[in-house]
C-alpha cells in the first residue's frame, strides 16, 4: 500500500459516514423526543400536507360536535319549557271540562274562567321569556336556525321552533250549518281530509224516526274522527219565541207521529200539564220538553232525530210556524283551523247545501279568553236553539201574526190598542217580509225598528245588542257558558296537539343532531388515527433506528481515530 500524508482517505470516509450517522441520529432523537415522525417539511413533504389537512379536519369536526351539543342544549331548553306549557294546557282543558256541565252556575263558571285566564298568562309568559344566550326560543322567531355540523362549509342542520303563545296555538275550525226544516237521505264526504284523500261516510237519513237524523250522522262522522280530524255535534231544539201563556193543544196534537191529544196548560205551564204530556211519550218520540229560564217552552231531541209538531200546540206555546218541523243544526269541529271541505248529495238536508248560510270561524286559544263575537258564537253552535230567527214565507207581517202558532191570531188578546206589551218575548226575533234575498236584510239603529229606504215591513224592535242581522248575539267569555266550555275543550285539545307537534319536530331534530354527533365523533377519531399514522413516530421502529445510528456514531468515531493513527506509521520510515 502507498503511504500518503496530505490526503487521509480513510479518515475522510470515516468522517463522511460519521456526518451522515450524526444527522440520522439527530433526526431519530428529534422523533423520539417529539413523538412525531414528521417534524419539518423535509421529513416528508407530501405526508406533512396530508397530515396537516387531516389535523384541520379533526379540529373542525371537534367544533362541529360542540355546535351540535349547543343545538341540543337549545332544543332541550325549549322542550322542557313546552312540557310545562302542556301541563298548563292540560289544566285548562280539565277546568273547561269541569265547567261543561249544567251543575255549574254562572258564578262558579266565572271563577273557573278567571283561573283559565291566569293559566293563559303564565303560558304566554313561558313563551315570551324562554331564551338561550339571549335568543327567544318560543316566540316564533326561532325559524330555520342553522348549526354547522361538518368539516366543510354549509354542512348544516336547520332547526325551527314554532310559536307557543296562546294567540298562535289552538287554532280550531268551527262550522255550523243552517237549521234544517226538510229531511231526506244524505251522502256526506270529507274532501282532502289529509291533504290528498277524500273520506266517504255511509248514507244517513234525516228524519224523525229512531236511528236517523243529525245524531246518526254525527255518530257516523265521529267514528272516524281520529282518522279525519273532524268531529261533529248536533243540536235539535225547538224553543218558543215567548214565555208560555195559557192555552190548549188540539185533539190531533202530535209529536213525531205520536198522538198526545188535547192538553190545557196555564201561564208558564204552572200546572206542568204541557211538559208532562210531552214527556210522557218521550221514549217513543225522542223529544223531551222543559221550561227554560225565561219561561219559554223548550223541546229537545236528545238522540238527534227531528222534531215534528203536528196538529196545533196552541197559541200560548209561541212556537214559530217555521219551527213546526225542525231537524236541527249540525256543527263540525276540526283541530287545525283549516276549512272543512265537504261534498255529497242532498247536503241541504244537513244545512250544508249550496244555498245554505253556513257559519264558520277559526278561533285561537287566546280568542276564547275574551268575549265571543256573535258570528264566532254562531259558528260554534250557540244559536242552534233558535235564539234568533228570520221569519220568512209570509207576504206581510199581518199574515204571520194571524198564522197558526204565532200567538197573535184572532182571540189572542194582542190586537191593536189592547195595551198589552209582548216585545220582551221577541227581543231576539226578526220578522222580514218582501225580502227576496239575504242582502235585502238591513241592520237598524237600536230601538228604531226600521231602516231607511229598506222598503221592508218589520215588527218587534230590532236591538243592536242582539248581535247580527240573523239574531245571533255576542256570548260571554270562555267557559262561562256550556257551549263556550265545550268550545274551550276543543280549542285546548287543538293547542295540546299543536305543542305536541312542535315538540315532536324538536325531538326529531334532536335525534338527528345526536346521530350526527355520533357519526362525526367516529369520523373525528378515524381522521385523527389517519393523521397519527402519518405524523406520529413508531417508537419501536425508531428506537431500533436510534440504536443503529448510535452504534454507527460510536464506530465511526473509532474508525476516524484508527484512520488518523495509521498516518503515524509514516514517521517510522523517516527514522
Curated annotation (Swiss-Prot):
Pfam families according to UniProt: Flagellin_C (PF00700), Flagellin_IN (PF07196), Flagellin_N (PF00669)
- Which SUPFAM superfamilies is this protein grouped with? Phase 1 flagellin (SSF64518)
Its localization reads: Secreted; Bacterial flagellum
> Which keywords label this protein?
Bacterial flagellum, Secreted
Main localization, broad class:
secreted
Its assembly, as annotated, is: Heteromer of flaA and flaB.
Q: What does this protein do?
A: Flagellin is the subunit protein which polymerizes to form the filaments of bacterial flagella.
| Similarity field | Belongs to the bacterial flagellin family.
This protein is called Flagellin B
The species is: Campylobacter jejuni
Amino acid at each position: 500500500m502507498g503511504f500518503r500524508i496530505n490526503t487521509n482517505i480513510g479518515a475522510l470516509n470515516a468522517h463522511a459516514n460519521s456526518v451522515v450517522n450524526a444527522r440520522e441520529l439527530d433526526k431519530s432523537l428529534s422523533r423520539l423526543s417529539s413523538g412525531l415522525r414528521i417534524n419539518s417539511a423535509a421529513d416528508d413533504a407530501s405526508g406533512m400536507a396530508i397530515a396537516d389537512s387531516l389535523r384541520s379536519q379533526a379540529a373542525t369536526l371537534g367544533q362541529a360536535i360542540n355546535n351540535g351539543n349547543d343545538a341540543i342544549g337549545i332544543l332541550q331548553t325549549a322542550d322542557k319549557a313546552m312540557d310545562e306549557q302542556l301541563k298548563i294546557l292540560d289544566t285548562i282543558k280539565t277546568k273547561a271540562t269541569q265547567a261543561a256541565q249544567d251543575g255549574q252556575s254562572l258564578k262558579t263558571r266565572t271563577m273557573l274562567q278567571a283561573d283559565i285566564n291566569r293559566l293563559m298568562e303564565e303560558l304566554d309568559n313561558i313563551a315570551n321569556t324562554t331564551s338561550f344566550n339571549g335568543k327567544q326560543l318560543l316566540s316564533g322567531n326561532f325559524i330555520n336556525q342553522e348549526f354547522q355540523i361538518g368539516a366543510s362549509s354549509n354542512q348544516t342542520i336547520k332547526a325551527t321552533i314554532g310559536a307557543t303563545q296562546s294567540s298562535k296555538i289552538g287554532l280550531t275550525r268551527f262550522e255550523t250549518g243552517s237549521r234544517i226544516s226538510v229531511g231526506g237521505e244524505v251522502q256526506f264526504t270529507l274532501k282532502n281530509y289529509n291533504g290528498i284523500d277524500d273520506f266517504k261516510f255511509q248514507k244517513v237519513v234525516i228524519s224523525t224516526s229512531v236511528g236517523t237524523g243529525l245524531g246518526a250522522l254525527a255518530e257516523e262522522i265521529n267514528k272516524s274522527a281520529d282518522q279525519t280530524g273532524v268531529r261533529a255535534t248536533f243540536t235539535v231544539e225547538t224553543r218558543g219565541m215567548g214565555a208560555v201563556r195559557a192555552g190548549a193543544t188540539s185533539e190531533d196534537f202530535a209529536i213525531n207521529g205520536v198522538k198526545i191529544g188535547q192538553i190545557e196548560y196555564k201561564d208558564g205551564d204552572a200546572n206542568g200539564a204541557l211538559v208532562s204530556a210531552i214527556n210522557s211519550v218521550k221514549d217513543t218520540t225522542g223529544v223531551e220538553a222543559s221550561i227554560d229560564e225565561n219561561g219559554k217552552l223548550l223541546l229537545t231531541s236528545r238522540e238527534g232525530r227531528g222534531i215534528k209538531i203536528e196538529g196545533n200546540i196552541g197559541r200560548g206555546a209561541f212556537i214559530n210556524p217555521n219551527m213546526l218541523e225542525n231537524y236541527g243544526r249540525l256543527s263540525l269541529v276540526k283541530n287545525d283551523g283549516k276549512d272543512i271541505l265537504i261534498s255529497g248529495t242532498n247536503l241541504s238536508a244537513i244545512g250544508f247545501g249550496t244555498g245554505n248560510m253556513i257559519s264558520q270561524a277559526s278561533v285561537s286559544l287566546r280568542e276564547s279568553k275574551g268575549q265571543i263575537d256573535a258570528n264566532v258564537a254562531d259558528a260554534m253552535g250557540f244559536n242552534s236553539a233558535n235564539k234568533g230567527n228570520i221569519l220568512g214565507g209570509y207576504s206581510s207581517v199581518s199574515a204571520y201574526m194571524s198564522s197558526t202558532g204565532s200567538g197573535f191570531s184572532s182571540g189572542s188578546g194582542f190586537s191593536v190598542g189592547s195595551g198589552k206589551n209582548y216585545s220582551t218575548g221577541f227581543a231576539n226575533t226578526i220578522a222580514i217580509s218582501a225580502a227576496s234575498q239575504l242582502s235585502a236584510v238591513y241592520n237598524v239603529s237600536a230601538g228604531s225598528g226600521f231602516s231607511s229606504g229598506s222598503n221592508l215591513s218589520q215588527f218587534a224592535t230590532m236591538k243592536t245588542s242582539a248581535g247580527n242581522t240573523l239574531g245571533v248575539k255576542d256570548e260571554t267569555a270562555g267557559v262561562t257558558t256550556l257551549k263556550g266550555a265545550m268550545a274551550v275543550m276543543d280549542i285546548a285539545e287543538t293547542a295540546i296537539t299543536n305543542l305536541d307537534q312542535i315538540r315532536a319536530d324538536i325531538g326529531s331534530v334532536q335525534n338527528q343532531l345526536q346521530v350526527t354527533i355520533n357519526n362525526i365523533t367516529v369520523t373525528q377519531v378515524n381522521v385523527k388515527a389517519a393523521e397519527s399514522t402519518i405524523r406520529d413516530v413508531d417508537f419501536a421502529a425508531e428506537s431500533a433506528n436510534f440504536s443503529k445510528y448510535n452504534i454507527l456514531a460510536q464506530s465511526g468515531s473509532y474508525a476516524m481515530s484508527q484512520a488518523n493513527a495509521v498516518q503515524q506509521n509514516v514517521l517510522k520510515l523517516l527514522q
